[in-house]
Regions:
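Pre-active-site segment of Zn-dependent metallo-hydrolases
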Residues: 1-24, 28, 35-47, 129-139
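Histidine-centered divalent metal-coordination motifs
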Residues: 22, 26-32, 103, 161-164
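Conserved beta-strand hairpin/beta-sheet module of binuclear metal-dependent hydrolase folds
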Residues: 1-13, 107-125
Length: 167
């Protein structure tokens, strides 16, 4: 995800974003997608190497609606890939599958990411998975090495917060 506070995260954690070229977006809330920052990929705002391959965003049609016009203005520096749930695709050597989530936006995703026989389930900002997602996970034959799960409100024993697991 690329949240509204991405810049401060880069400063606080010493992350050089110039080496990051791909980003999976889970959903369109501003704490996960802040498209205004991508305006700075336009000519006149930043100096990029001549061979810059672009910053690739992957997400649902909801994400596309938020970033399409910005991407057009960046002359190929922001590249959007509209992905569908349960249809694996590759980013380099990583196999990525968007899975349906439940989170109060029309098409939220969580991601199953596989590389060299290792798998990660990235499942933030989702309630208990929809049945289609459970079915896919049961049938796909992947053994997870790690899972990163939603923990919003996890310290509150009796919190009911639709769109979050609260674990």
């Amino acid at each position: 995800d690329y949240p509204c506070d991405a810049y401060i995260h880069s400063i606080q954690n010493g992350i050089d974003y110039s080496g990051i070229h791909h980003c999976l977006i889970t959903h369109i809330h501003a704490d996960h997608l802040y498209p205004s920052d991508f305006e700075y990929l336009r000519s006149g705002f930043c100096k990029l190497p001549e061979d810059y391959e672009g910053f690739h965003l992957y997400g649902s049609v909801d994400v596309e609606a938020k970033v399409a016009k910005i991407a057009e203005r960046t002359n190929g520096k922001l590249v959007f890939h509209c992905i569908k749930p349960f249809e694996p695709f590759f980013i380099g050597e990583m196999k990525v599958t968007a899975l349906k989530a439940l989170h109060g936006t029309p098409n939220p995703y969580i991601y199953l990411i596989e590389k060299n026989g290792t798998a990660l389930l990235y499942a933030h900002d989702t309630d208990i998975f929809p049945e289609e997602t459970w079915d896919y996970l049961r049938k796909c034959g992947v053994t997870l090495r790690a899972a990163s799960l939603d923990c919003t409100g996890g310290v509150h024993e009796d919190l009911e917060y639709t769109g979050h697991m609260c674990v």
